[in-house]
Amino acid sequence: VEKIIESSLLLCALSCILTIFLIILFIITQGMPIILKEGPVDFVTGTTWDPYNDIYNIFPMIVGTFVVTLLSLVIAIPLGLGCAMLIAEIAPHQVRSIIRPAIETLAAIPSVIYGLFGLIVLVPFIRDNVVPFAHDYIGWIPLVGGLVGTQGNGFGVLAGGIILAIMILPTIISISEDSLRAVPRELREGSLAMGATKWQMITGIVTPAALSGIVAGAVLGMGRAIGETMAVLMVCGNSTIIPTSLLSMARPMTSAIALEWNYASGDHQVALFAIGIVLLAVIMILNLVIYLANRKKLNFARM
C-alpha cells in the first residue's frame, strides 16, 4: 500500500513538473519566431509597437511594467514591513486577532474589484486633486517636477502603482511577519539584557536577522505585481509610449496581451506570445532570487 501511495505522489509531482515544462515550451515555440525576425535586441529595446505595420518592439511596455512595479514596491515595502513589525513584535493578541483577518481579506479580494476601485475612486481623485496640485506647486521644482509631471487625466503610473501596492501588501506583510517570528528568541533576550530598548531590539537585531525573508517577501510581491493584469489594465491608461513621469499613462506587458489578444492574428499574435516569453524570464529570475534568499534564511535558522 505504501508503495502505491508513494508512486501516486511521485506521479502527481512529475505531472506538475511536466505541465509547467510543456507550458513554457509552448510559449517559447509560439513566440520565438517574432523575436528572431525582429532581432532579440531590437525586440526588447525598440520603442515602436505598431501591429498594423508589423513593427513589434516592447521597450515602452517593459519600462511601463517596471516603473509601475517599482512605485508599488516603494509604497508597499515600508507599509508592509511596519505592519509586520507591529503584528510580530508590538501588538497585543487582541489587536493581532483583528489585523490578521483584515490582511487575509485584503488578499482574497479579486483583482477586478481593485481595478474598479481604482477606476471609480482613485483615477478621478488623481485627476481632480493631484494633477492640479502638481501643476501649481510641484511642476516648477527641478527634477521633482519632471518626475511627478504636471499633466494627466488620472490614468497612469501613479494610479497603477497605488493599486498594485494595496494588492501586494498582504504578501509582504505575511512573509515579513513569518521571518521576524523565526528569529531566535535568544537574540531578543540578549539585546534587551544589554540595555537596548524594544525599538532598538526590533530595528537593530530582529529586522537585520530576518532580512533575507523580508527580501523574499518583497521579491514575491514584485512577482505578483509584474504578473497582475486586470487592475493595471483598468487604471494605467494603456499608452504604448514610454512613461516619463508618475502622471504619464503606461501599458504594462500583461495589459498588452489582455487588450490585443482577441483581435490579434499572424505575427501580431506571435508577438504577444513573445511578450509572454519576456514575462516568463522575469518571473523565473525572481523565483531564483526567492529561492536563494530562502536558502540563506534556512541556513541561518540551523545555526
PLM regions: where:
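C-terminal transmembrane helix and the adjacent membrane-cytosol boundary/short C-terminal tail
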Residues: 177-181, 185, 262-303
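N-terminal signal-anchor/first transmembrane alpha helix
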Residues: 1-25
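Transmembrane-helix boundary motif in ABC transporter permease subunits
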Residues: 72-103, 134, 290-296
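Membrane-interfacial helix termini and adjacent extracytoplasmic/periplasmic loops
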Residues: 37-56, 116-166
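Interhelical loop and adjacent transmembrane-helix boundary motif
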Residues: 232-280
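Hydrophobic positions within alpha-helical transmembrane segments of bacterial inner-membrane proteins
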Residues: 18, 65, 69, 73-81, ...
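Periplasmic/extracellular loop-to-transmembrane helix junction in inner-membrane transport proteins
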Residues: 1-3, 7-8, 28-72, 92-93, ...
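Transmembrane alpha-helices
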Residues: 102-105, 109, 113, 172-176, ...
